[in-house]
């Protein structure tokens, strides 16, 4: 895609580099602007914002390479594209797939141009220190049209007579680094959204929380292997499968209130429920003699009388 033909004179290479850097300046900063707008406008949910903040804190080597990431995202999005589904995760993931594909190639081309310009830079030229280069956080505060002039002013402050080829190389270095950082942020967002389509947003949030806990735990106190999202979803899948297989053969527990057991006592060889029968008087308890008729009863004389 990228073919660079260097001119034999430093002036020709400088002209070619100036044209390349100025023409690509707008394209370079588009991913940066898109990610800033995304964070401030497109995602206002509190729980999702916390989960995304956790995604930003994960190590860089946790995420797949850009080529593998885009391929996996397309595989996850293909059923939704065919069904023309309009969902939040589908729309945003599709946006980042297109953005990463386009500007990853642009970033690679700029890196190749910067490497080719090294051949025409005077060997005695000292590279511009990091303190004179625009950082990612500073680029968010600088207007887009002032980005080139701001970096040029910093180069002049470092060395007023800095060679023009070295200046172009410095500009390309800065823009490539800014683009790579913006693409890394977009890569993490793409990973989040297409995994939410595969596993569900709640499951991915739970997985990220467990993974961060595992990473923050000292090595001697944590498990040998990091948690996986498959292990989190496996118990749910097994439970659902078990219910489908045993349906109709066993009554599930906990769906109906249990009946209270009725206490019974033995009365003359038969069982009598206390809850169903009325409470008998003290003189008619089980096992007591029948009461005598007091009307016909004559009182025995007292021995004192």
UniProtKB/Swiss-Prot annotation:
GO terms for cellular component: extracellular region. Transmembrane segments: none annotated. Residues 294-305 have a biased composition (Polar residues). InterPro entries: Hepatitis_core (IPR002006), Viral_capsid_core_dom_sf_HBV (IPR036459). GO terms for molecular function: structural molecule activity. Residues 248-279 have a biased composition (Basic residues). Belongs to the avihepadnavirus precore antigen family. May regulate immune response to the intracellular capsid in acting as a T-cell tolerogen, by having an immunoregulatory effect which prevents destruction of infected cells by cytotoxic T-cells. This is External core antigen. The gene is C.
């Amino acid at each position: 895609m990228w073919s660079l033909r260097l001119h034999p004179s430093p002036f020709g290479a400088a002209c070619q580099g100036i044209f390349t850097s100025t023409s690509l300046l707008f394209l370079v900063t588009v991913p940066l602007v898109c990610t800033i707008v995304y964070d401030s406008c497109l995602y206002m949910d509190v729980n999702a914002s916390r989960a995304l903040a956790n995604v930003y804190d994960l190590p860089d080597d946790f995420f797949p390479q850009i080529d593998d990431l885009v391929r996996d995202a397309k595989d996850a999005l293909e059923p939704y594209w065919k069904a023309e589904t309009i969902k939040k995760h589908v729309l945003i993931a599709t946006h980042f797939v297109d953005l990463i594909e386009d500007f990853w190639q642009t970033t690679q081309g700029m890196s190749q141009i910067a490497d080719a310009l090294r051949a025409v830079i005077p060997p005695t030229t000292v590279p511009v220190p990091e303190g004179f280069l625009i950082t990612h956080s500073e680029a968010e505060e600088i207007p887009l049209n002032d980005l080139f002039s701001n970096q040029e002013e910093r180069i002049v402050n470092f060395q007023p007579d800095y060679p023009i080829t070295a200046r172009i190389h410095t500009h390309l270095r800065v823009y490539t680094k800014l683009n790579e950082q913006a693409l890394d942020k977009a890569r993490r967002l793409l990973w989040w959204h297409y995994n939410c389509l595969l596993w569900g947003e709640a499951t991915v949030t739970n997985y990220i929380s467990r993974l961060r806990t595992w990473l923050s735990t000292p090595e001697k106190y944590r498990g040998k292997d990091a948690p996986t999202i498959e292990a989190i979803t496996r118990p749910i899948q097994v439970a659902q499968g078990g219910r489908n297989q045993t349906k109709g053969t066993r009554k599930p527990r906990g769906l109906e209130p249990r009946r209270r057991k009725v206490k019974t006592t033995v009365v003359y060889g038969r069982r009598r429920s206390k809850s169903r029968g009325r409470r008998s008087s003290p003189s008619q308890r089980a096992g007591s003699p029948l009461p005598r008729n007091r009307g016909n009863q004559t009182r025995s004389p007292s021995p004192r009388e």
